[in-house]
Design a protein with these regions (language model features):
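Residue-level detector of solvent-exposed, low-hydrophobicity positions
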Residues: 74, 85, 127, 165-166
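Hydrophobic recognition helices of helix-based DNA-binding modules
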Residues: 167-171
Length: 171
């Protein structure tokens, strides 16, 4: 598993290549001032952003669109037409976990249920899709486990992969 930790002037961004086509991000601002984070990702990925603590804002298209995500809420973003690189601002003492999954990988996980997933059904195929959602208790438990990650380094990749799959099945 490839892990990168990037200390920005304020805040920390950790990214983990969990599996082919799946990236897990942990954005943490434990400072007393607002922190900004950027992460390049192509348009072939679905973005799930979960605000665990505090509040955040995701800006796209040179700041023309912004999506606030407050504690215990999430946003799903998919735009097959335009690149959506991540440009996030986190308020002080905030934590956001993100799962970036390629559309190909997502389809392979849910091919039998594709018609039940609103943005994968035939009517929406190829269209952009944005959805905000309050986190339920089961999803919150999984996200808190992912944030804590108290497993041995040799098992870390397997643990994150299992948690991402669990998270996707609950979402």
């Amino acid at each position: 598993m490839e892990t990168k930790v990037k200390n920005i002037a304020i805040g920390t961004l950790q990214d983990y290549l969990v599996d082919e086509g799946i990236i897990f991000l942990k954005l943490l601002n434990d400072e007393e001032v607002r922190a900004s984070f950027e992460y390049e990702i192509d348009k072939n990925h679905i973005q799930f952003h979960f605000c665990i603590k505090g509040s955040s804002e995701f800006n796209f298209n040179n700041g023309n669109y912004s999506f606030p995500v407050i504690s215990e809420n999430s946003i799903l973003l998919y735009n097959p037409v335009q690149e959506l690189p991540i440009n996030a601002s986190l308020e002080p003492n905030s934590l956001v976990l993100s799962v970036l999954i390629s559309i190909k990988k997502f389809h392979s996980l849910f091919s039998d249920q594709a018609d039940q997933i609103s943005f994968l059904n035939q009517d929406n195929a190829g269209n952009k899709f944005y959805k905000d959602k309050k986190l339920g208790p089961m999803i919150s438990v999984v996200l808190n486990q992912m944030a804590q990650q108290s497993v041995h380094e040799s098992m870390h990749n397997l643990y994150l992969r299992a948690k991402v799959f669990e998270l996707m099945s609950l979402y």
